[in-house]
């Protein structure tokens, strides 16, 4: 039966647990699958999390058990320890690239397509922003037979240059409320944050171009010599 977040949405803890498993599988494969303790640490880390959460071991275990019933997590038992891995793409019914984008939205909150491309660098290298947008559009246009949309494009926030995307795995969202900038941040702070994002995107593009040039010339990139 297709996953339908409108009738059986994930809880906030389930979303954090599932996305953390996906993240660690991509970024620290040598430590994956995860023990319960490692998973809780990943769920509660301060970096790359919005919102920051305080998930207990009991809450994480309950979420894992619930996700397993939905075929979204898998328990691997051994003599040394019980570990867990995700079954995100198959459990939700989406390709790997879409699972990456959904996980980032669950971990970091609403983001623009450009931010998603930058933040996914260690997970999956999308060719360009258009590629990211294509997968997002597929998720937004997911048919009713498959369980309906999994993302929504938020209205442009005041002063913002681009619209942000939000996931729907935890059910419907208040798109107008989510589109508003944080109350504590002023327009100047928003503009600065956007400028940083733009600069990071430019740096990523320049690095990719330089790597391509070095590869074409058969040269070794600086700092990579043995």
Curated annotation (Swiss-Prot):
- Cross-referenced Pfam families: DUF480 (PF04337)
Q: Which domain of life is it from?
A: Bacteria
Among SUPFAM superfamilies, the record links this protein to: Winged helix' DNA-binding domain
Please list which residues make up the signal peptide.
Answer: none
Q: Which family does it belong to?
A: Belongs to the UPF0502 family.
User: What is this protein called in UniProt?
Assistant: UPF0502 protein Daci_5373
- According to its UniProt entry, this protein's organism is Delftia acidovorans (strain DSM 14801 / SPH-1)
């Amino acid at each position: 039966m297709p996953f339908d977040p409108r009738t059986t949405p994930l809880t906030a803890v389930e979303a954090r647990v599932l996305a953390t498993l996906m993240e660690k599988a991509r970024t620290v494969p040598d430590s994956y699958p995860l023990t319960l303790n490692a998973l809780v640490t990943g769920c509660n880390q301060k970096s790359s999390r919005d919102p920051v959460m305080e998930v207990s071991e009991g809450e994480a275990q309950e979420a894992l058990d619930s996700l397993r019933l939905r075929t979204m997590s898998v328990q691997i038992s051994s003599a040394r320890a019980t570990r867990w891995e995700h079954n995100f793409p198959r459990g939700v019914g989406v390709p790997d690239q879409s699972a990456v984008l959904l996980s980032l939205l669950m971990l970091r909150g609403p983001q623009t397509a450009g931010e998603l491309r930058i933040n996914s660098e260690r997970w999956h290298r999308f060719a360009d922003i258009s590629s990211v947008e294509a997968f997002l559009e597929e998720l937004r246009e997911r048919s009713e037979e498959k369980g309906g949309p999994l993302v929504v494009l938020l209205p442009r926030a005041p002063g913002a240059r681009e619209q942000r995307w939000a996931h729907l795995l935890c059910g419907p969202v208040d798109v107008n409320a989510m589109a508003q900038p944080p109350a504590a941040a002023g327009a100047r702070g928003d503009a600065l944050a956007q400028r940083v994002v733009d600069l990071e995107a430019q740096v990523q593009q320049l690095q990719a171009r330089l790597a391509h040039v070095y590869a074409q010339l058969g040269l070794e990139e600086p700092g990579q010599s043995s």
